[in-house]
Swiss-Prot record:
Residues reported in the UniProt entry to bind (S)-2,3,4,5-tetrahydrodipicolinate: H146, G155, T156
Family membership noted in the UniProt record: Belongs to the DapB family.
Domain of life where this protein originates: Bacteria
Active site (catalytic residues): H145 (proton donor/acceptor), K149 (proton donor)
Protein name: 4-hydroxy-tetrahydrodipicolinate reductase 2
Example of a GO MF term: 4-hydroxy-tetrahydrodipicolinate reductase
NCBIfam families documented for this protein: dapB
Coiled coil regions in record: none
Pathway(s) per entry: Amino-acid biosynthesis; L-lysine biosynthesis via DAP pathway; (S)-tetrahydrodipicolinate from L-aspartate: step 4/4
Keywords: Amino-acid biosynthesis, Cytoplasm, Diaminopimelate biosynthesis, Lysine biosynthesis, NAD, NADP, Oxidoreductase
Function: Catalyzes the conversion of 4-hydroxy-tetrahydrodipicolinate (HTPA) to tetrahydrodipicolinate.
Subcellular location(s) of the protein: Cytoplasm
């Protein structure tokens, strides 16, 4: 007997990724678009309130803002569901703590990128960081996005930074250099640098360079269309539906070894 489609609600349904997700869900026979919601004052014309959407869905896919995502996680946990797929970026420590607390009650997949290729890049970067001694190999992360992106470095760039730091057995916050300006002095060993570009309609470009005396290794990924993020979010929604509570990421969804 065929399984019934998983009921999906889309948060931020009028945003760029929200509109992309609506189209992708409607095109997938494994899913049913149960509800769309946006801001509290955006109801009607096919949009419902957040509370109505949560009651109608098995999984909510959320590409909104850090504050909205953290609040959504709290509300979902308080009512015992539904599961969440969160693609928002730019969270502060308190918002991340709220999501982690909610994940004790409901299953949540949160990722800075839902691209399969990008998540493969994260794994390769971590392997390279383990192999390249920080005393000899400097790590630099570059990212570029469209002019409308409001956080920097991007969530994906921070994922890559975490991969470098994790491969080296370090804490990213202790070794990250997010800004360089003026007379900065010589680069300390083990530092992880970030460079950011914002302009035009760039969907997303990321690279990690390991620089040693006489050689340079660069691993990179470029996004040409937001549909790849939608495909990854759908894979996450299919995977997380029916899972036990916990905070998961795309490595769990894709079955990558830790």
């Amino acid at each position: 007997m065929a399984q019934p489609p998983i009921r999906i609600a889309i948060a931020g349904a009028l945003g760029r990724m929200g509109r992309q997700m609506v189209e992708a869900v409607q095109a997938d026979p494994r899913l049913a678009l149960a509800a769309r919601f946006h801001r509290p004052d955006s109801v009607g014309d096919g949009l419902v309130s957040r509370d109505e959407a949560l009651a109608m869905a098995d999984v909510v896919i959320d590409f909104t803002t850090p504050a909205a995502s953290a609040d959504l996680a709290r509300v979902s946990a308080n009512r015992g569901g539904p599961a969440l797929v969160i693609g928002s970026t730019g969270f502060d420590a308190a918002e991340l703590a709220d999501i982690a607390d909610a994940a004790k009650t409901v299953p949540i997949v949160r990722s800075g990128s839902f691209s399969l290729g990008l998540n493969m890049l994260v794994g390769l970067v971590e392997q390279a960081a383990r192999a390249f001694a920080p005393e000899d190999w400097d790590a630099e992360i570059f990212e570029a996005h469209h002019r409308h992106k409001i956080d920097a470095p991007s969530g994906t760039a921070l994922m890559l930074g975490q991969a470098v730091a994790g491969g080296r057995g370090a804490e990213l916050d202790a070794v990250a250099r997010r800004v360089r300006d003026g007379v900065t002095g010589a680069r300390p060993p083990g530092e992880i640098g970030f460079a950011v570009v914002r302009g035009g309609s760039i969907v997303g470009e990321h690279s990690v360079s390991f620089c040693a005396e006489g050689e340079l290794v660069t691993l990179s990924h470029a996004a040409g269309d937001r549909i790849m993020f939608a495909r990854g979010a759908i894979a996450a929604a299919l995977w997380v539906s029916g899972r036990p509570p916990g905070e998961y990421d795309m490595r769990d969804v894709l079955g990558f070894d830790r």
